[in-house]
Structure formats: C-alpha cells, structure tokens
Amino acid sequence: MVVVILIGVLAVMAIPAMTTAQIDRRAYNDAILVAELFREARTRAMGRGSAEMILMTSPGSAAGGDRGTFQLWEGQVMAALSILPVGSPMSTCGFPTVWPALAATPGTVLAAGATAQLVDGVNLNGTIESQDQIWTTITGPGGVNMSSGAYMCFTPLGRTYFTAGNGGTNFVSGTPFLGELQISVQRALGGVQVGITRTVVVPNSGATRIVSK
C-alpha cells in the first residue's frame, strides 16, 4: 500500500514538468512546420519550374493578434487569354508575375489580380497556440524586426529574393537575397516569455535549420 501511495505522489509531482515538456514540444512542432514550408518552396521551384513565394506575417504577440501566418504561393498563368495555357508555371519572381500583398483568408486559394495560387501554408492562430501562448517573431538581415510582413521568393534557377513590409512584393531583378532570415517560435506564461525558443534559420538556399536555446 505504501508503495502505491509513493508512486501516486511521484506521479503528481511530475505533472508540472510533463505539462511544460508537452507545451515545448508543441512549439517545436510549429517550428518544424514553418521550416518545412520553406524547404517545400525551394523544392517546388526546382521541380515545377515556377517561382514560389512565401508570404509571412506575425504582428501579434503572446497575448493575441496574428501569432504567425505563413503562406506558400506558386506563380501560375491565371488568365485564359494568355499566350500560355492556364496553370502554366511562371518562373520569375518579378514582373510579369504578380504576387498577392496580403494573406489569403481561410478557404481561399486565389487573390484578385495575382498570377499565383495558394498551394500550402502554416497558420499559428489555432486553439493550441492561443491556449499555450505560442507566437512568432520574424527577423531579417541585420537583425531588423519584420513581423509586420515579409516575402521570400525562390526561382527554378536557384535564386532567392526577399522584400519586407506589408505593402506588397517588390522583388528587384539582379539583387538576390543575401544573409539569412530568422523566425523565432516561442511561448509565454502569464504574458512572460518562458521555455525554449525555437529559431528557424532560413538562408538564401532555403535549406532551413532549427536552433533551440
């Protein structure tokens, strides 16, 4: 009987640590999803022969707002009167490819005026993220905070372009992205950041890695 009681006491004592580990694991899983989205974009660009653009926003915080939205768009011919058939790949990040400036609403795969289609995405505004106070911050080259909006585009030839802001894409030909993008996935408790921060490091090759600290 004493042994049973001791086991019960030890199990109860372990609950807080197990709960913390579970929440940290959820944040890590979110970081994996974000990292894989960039790898998917790089792979699709080479495999499909089309430009692939990731639109990202995270102006929110642990308390709420947009905790992190990442959408993968593929450049495609969308108009029937084009020289190429509808659905044909568009291989350039700049003109004549037109990218959406804002994230698509749930259930939407097209954007007005854009020559691109939404093919995948990661939305960190779910019930679990809200409950566990998980959110992301985006840091561009030079340590500049870009949570209000940023865009990264991969071409089939291996070039990567990047632009920041929420006013729309502005990929300039001949000026490929240099440096790295960092997306930190963290969590809070009572509004105070706690636990392990998972940082998704995105170089211009698109070969992401996750740093935990």
Give the predicted meaning of each segment:
Residues 1, 9-39, 43, 51, ...:
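N-terminal helix-rich module
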